[in-house]
Amino acid sequence: NSYTWYVNQFKDHPAILMWEFGNEFNYHPEWFNNNIQNWYDQLENCAATVKSLDPDHPVSTGHGEVPSSQALNSCPSVDVWGMNIYRWLSPDSAIDELAAQTDKAMYISEAGADSFNSNSNSENEAEQAQATEIILNKIIENSDLCIGVTLFEFCDEWWKAGNPNQQDIGGFSNAIPYDSFANEEYWGIVTRDRTPKQSYYVVQEIYESTSL
């Protein structure tokens, strides 16, 4: 219950947009005695508690993919459904799917592309920039349904696929443009030392031209 301390401590801070519980917990029933309903019950309890402590901010969760009817029906106190979506260049399909199930607010809590192409075994910043532009624009085009997006991610992480003192190749198969592989240490729009990649300037241009 340490979260209640954080809510009470920071609920009046102007930087608080909303409170969010969990990141892709729905992918891990093993954390909840192999029964994902235990997570949804806990999420609902936490969301209801936060709303009683702070009625001025919505409560969200970072859900892996589109939430099921089980998740939606179990958590009426969740105001905003975040979705981590990796569907090649089509995050908008997930927006349509959730909108068909609920009128609750939604946002894309993760989306993006990495800068390493496993097919060519080389870094390809241009591909990442192109994919990032398409993904972000498709989300923005659906702003009547989707309130925003958190791009994954700002900075490369060197700890995820091997030696943390060097940038390693490694990850897993997924619907990631343009090689269907998520290279875990190449997701940043800047390098570890904060050198901007091509995708950084794409993101900058999109956000500068978008009305918020």
Which residues are covered by each model-predicted region?
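Extracellular glycoside hydrolase catalytic/binding regions
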Residues: 30-141
